Amino acid sequence: MTLDKEKYWKKVSLLENFFRSKLKYHRDKIYEIIFKKIEFNGKKILDVGSTPDLDDHHNTLIHKIKTNKEITCLSNFDCSILKKLNSNIEIIKGDGLNTKLKDNTFDIVHSSATIEHVGSEYNQNQFIKECLRISKKTVIITTPNRFFPIDFHTKIPFIHFLPKKIHRKLLVLTNNHFFSKEENLNLLSINDLRKYLKKSNIRDFEIF
């Protein structure tokens, strides 16, 4: 039996497009809720974990508030390309675990799908604490739910429900070496988030 590579990659492409469309749908629904609850106009905003990509699959908040006059992007990548989306954007190259910014610098600190990539549980706790430290009032952190049926990073269903050590071994076996390492992917559940927030003595929060 021979593999028709053209048909194979066409199917892979169709599957990728399906996942992207589903992810966009759910992400848009989440931001609908966020914009109903939080006023962004006239606020000083920091986006932690921006990526150097103009596709609206990335940097969701920046795409949705293009007219905002005070938005800063902090990333360990060079994100100067994002000025094409909004010339008012200020770019800072830095580390979300230690931003070196002053306390209470921003009205809103936002981070989308970054916390699952900062590494260990300790690092994830530190990431939350740092976002809280530099925000005057509001912190928004989005991350995929570990117990959603499909992991959107690997496109593999269900195996991420398993204990993390077993999950990582299976990722190696499926040639997902990058995501098999904790420093590159450490998925969180709703209970994980609650636990981290309680560790930071945060009582006023919503998870949705």
Name each model-derived stretch.
Residues E32, K129, N191-K195:
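Active-site phosphate/pyrophosphate- and oxyanion-stabilizing loops and adjacent acidic/basic residues
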Residues T138-H167:
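Conserved class I S-adenosyl-L-methionine
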Residues I202-F208:
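Conserved S-adenosyl-L-methionine
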Residues K37-I38, K43-F148:
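Conserved SAM-binding loop
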Residues F178-N201:
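Short alpha-helix
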Residues K22-I30, N123, L185-D192:
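Soluble or luminal CAZymes and related metallo-dependent hydrolases
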Residues L15-N17, L173-E183:
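Short glycine/proline- and acidic residue-enriched helix-loop micro-motifs
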Residues M1-E39:
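Class I SAM-dependent methyltransferase Rossmann-like catalytic core
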